[in-house]
Amino acid sequence: MRAVTWQGPRRVETQDVPDPSLAEDTDAIVQVSATAICGSDLHLYEVLAPYLTRGDILGHEAMGTVVEAGGAVTRVRPGDCVVIPFNIACGACWMCARGLQSQCEVTQVRAQGKGATLFGYTSLYGSVPGGQAEYVRVPHADYGLIPVPQGGPDERWLYLSDILPTAWQAARYADVTPGDTVAVVGLGPVGHLAARCALRQGAERVIGVDLVPERLQRAREAGIEVVGDTDDTPAAVLELTGGRGADRVIESVGMEAHGDPVVAGMLGVVSRLPKPVSVPLAENAAVDRLSAPPGRVRLGPPRWDGVDPGRVRRCGEPNQHDGTLRQAAHAAHGSGQRPPLERRTAADDRGGRRRLRHRAPRHPPAAP
């Protein structure tokens, strides 16, 4: 089969590799119909080279059709259309039962001191071959695969693999309630969807903050108010809200970007959040999504929620059966470009770490 492989820092190639096969009776093989480049993939492109081996298959956002299933797999069968979540979990351990699938005790990479195994994401997370390929082996398939309806564009469901549950969860952690004004800092793929999820969860107004004109325009088209290039973002948000500020703030700039200055500005946007509260939060709560605290800092009404790998939920129980989330998947489809798998390298070179702006679904070439 053809697959996108890591060959060194800033070097990926589409190569011929062996087809995957069942390794356990709980596995399934999925023929990939669409996959996507995630912002996390760009960490592999440059930063996480020490944890990759030449030839590793990349990708952790994919969907397709089940073509083979192990004897213990009963929930899906060949011919089913499925989405493959980023994290690999058993669904039955203590962590999974509490919605912390990315800390699954069965697939946890204990030797590395990390959480559950992840598709296409370095030796730190199990070196599991990823989904930017024509076929992928899915462990714990009964729990890991999300059946979706046949027909329609893949992009209608593809984002359920990672980005949409992440955005939905951010809005949930912000405790968005009807009538709220929500500020979203960073309108990249996750931030854009988090803003739209906040609207679907009842926010009366959502104000998005970014510097990229294309992102601001896409947000406007989705009914999101925007704040662009300004010397004083908190002042701009305060002006839009009559001096009251936002009720909830979602920070989605990510670990590559501006760091503490953005977070400091974000804290200043929150309604009535005094410096004696905001400064200790900024000093003691990490903001990188790979190091944010799994707990919650609570000082009276203001609260900082950390979203680290231990709290990032899959689109599964309880979210898998959340009809509103599935409705959001319908609303999210259709964005980004759709080059074939063979053009993955060019897409990375064109995007770069600081220029990637939109999701990019990938479609393996049609069979002859």
Residue ranges and their predicted role:
Residues M1, P294-R298, R338-P368:
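C-terminal hydrophobic helical "lid"/dimerization subdomain
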Residues P18-T35, L48-A97, Q101-S102, P129, ...:
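Glycine-rich beta-strand-centered segment in the early N-terminal region that forms part
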Residues A23-D25, R77, T177, R244, ...:
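Residue-level recognition of short, solvent-exposed, well-ordered loop/turn junctions
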Residues C38, F86-Q150:
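Cysteine-cluster motifs in flexible loop/terminal segments that predominantly coordinate metals
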Residues G39-Y45:
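Cytochrome P450 core scaffold surrounding the K-helix E-X-X-R motif
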Residues C81-V82, E134-Y135, Y143-D231, A235, ...:
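Mid-domain Rossmann-like dinucleotide-binding core that forms the NAD(H)/NADP(H) cofactor-binding site
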Residues A174, Q217-H330:
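Glycine-rich cofactor phosphate-binding loops and adjacent beta1-alpha1 units
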Residues V212, V312, Q337:
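Residues in the short beta-alpha loop(s) of Rossmann-like NAD(P)-binding domains
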